[in-house]
Amino acid sequence: MDEARKLKIAAAAEALTYVKDGMRLGIGTGSTAEEFVRLLAEKVKGGFRVIGVPTSERTAKLCEELGVALTTLEETPHLDLTIDGADEVDGELSLIKGGGGALLREKIVAAASDSMIVIADQSKVVETLGRFPLPIEVNRFGLGATIRAIEAAAVKCGLAGPLNLRLKDGSPFLTDGGHYIVDASFGRIPDPKTLSDALFAIPGVVEHGLFIGLARAAIIAGTDGIRTMNRS
């Protein structure tokens, strides 16, 4: 097993200690979240009771294969806790998420939860967000106009950089909701809130990967052990 996977498992194992029997749980998407699902499934086999809302079809499939009971936000609109990964996390626990393409559902599930705990390895911790390209989920209609509006909004925020339509097997990547994703390489984002507001003002933008004020804590695994970052 490589070192990167060991760190993901370590963070996932620590997060599992926050999950109590009978909880309604939001379950994230991505490689670290999948390690959490595998550990959770082992506890479920031993009689531990949880019911989960997955943030993607991929996560739902893994949960079903491993025997983790699932529900929906229609049936269970209020969740106790969400456990999810992140592409970047800063000292204020603002995040960039969406590398796996599930940012819309991830944000809906996190917002429906009493709290959100992020699991990640040390490489995801940054002083300022933006090293990882920011995923922006957009409606397929009017793509060119939407990209132009994103560029203009970024300039007003003092940002610029390539906007790339995400591809999969040579065709535009489609989210579970049937939307495109534009990956914005703005570089450092010193004011995530201002950029967030500017992006949401664009009609063609469905969602973006800036998660601000949602994470309560981040469990960070490094070669020297586990540390927990808490939002001030």
Curated annotation (Swiss-Prot):
For this protein, the record's InterPro entries field holds:
NagB/RpiA_transferase-like, Ribose-5P_isomerase, Ribose5P_isomerase_typA_subgr, Ribose5P_isomerase_type_A
Output the superkingdom of the source species: Bacteria
Keywords of the record: Isomerase
**What pathway, per the record?**
Carbohydrate degradation; pentose phosphate pathway; D-ribose 5-phosphate from D-ribulose 5-phosphate (non-oxidative stage): step 1/1
- Subunit: Homodimer.
HAMAP family according to UniProt: Rib_5P_isom_A
Task: Quote the protein name from its UniProt record.
Answer: Ribose-5-phosphate isomerase A
Residues reported to bind substrate? 29-32, 84-87, 97-100, 124
Query: What taxonomic ancestry is recorded?
Result: Bacteria, Pseudomonadati, Pseudomonadota, Alphaproteobacteria, Hyphomicrobiales
- Role played: Catalyzes the reversible conversion of ribose-5-phosphate to ribulose 5-phosphate.
